[in-house]
Amino acid sequence: VVARKSFLENSPKEVPTMLRYDTYLKKNSLYNTPPAFGIYMVGKVVSWIKANGGLEAMAKKNAAKAKLVYDAIDNSDGFYVGHADKDSRSFMNVTFRLPSEELEAKFAKEALEHGLGGVKGHRSVGGMRTSIYNAMPMEGCQALVDFMEKFRKANK
């Protein structure tokens, strides 16, 4: 930034420290090193979202993926039971329980054998947690649902 020193010295005090020119003037531009890798990664993610239709398209895709998995839970005749109330369900992390902890352990083991890793729930909550973040394709969610149905039929 090229500016008169008197202008830089009179930064409004209500402006956050990191956004005030006088902060950097007093510290010879060395007040803080920006998190370069984090900034780089945010740029990559934003570019990817734009290339894939933008936020509206991403929201539609995520809603469709979540619906697919939640429908498998809701239509399982009680074999799978969701943790969250229907009006509070996440589009990113679908959590559910099985009839017993033994079946949950078996589900996690067999899911891994079918290429579906990381489905074990949080240690304080238990059950299953399937993460279907933005980059997870619909095909991955369909593979999960297919496995869930196969597992349910074999273990009901």
Q: Which residues does each PLM region occupy?
A:
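Short beta-strand-to-loop capping motifs
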Residues: 3, 96-100, 132-134
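Conserved PLP cofactor-binding pocket of PLP-dependent enzymes
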Residues: 114-132
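Short amphipathic alpha-helices in soluble, non-transmembrane regions
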Residues: 105-114, 143-149
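Active-site C-terminal subdomain of aminotransferase-like
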Residues: 2-70, 85, 154-156
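PLP-dependent enzyme catalytic core of the Aspartate aminotransferase-like
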Residues: 126-156
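Short, flexible, solvent-exposed loop/turn segments with mixed acidic/basic and small polar residues
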Residues: 48, 82-87, 119-122
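Short amphipathic beta-strand starts and helix->beta connectors
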Residues: 73-80, 111-117
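Conserved PLP-binding catalytic core of the aspartate aminotransferase-like
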Residues: 80-111
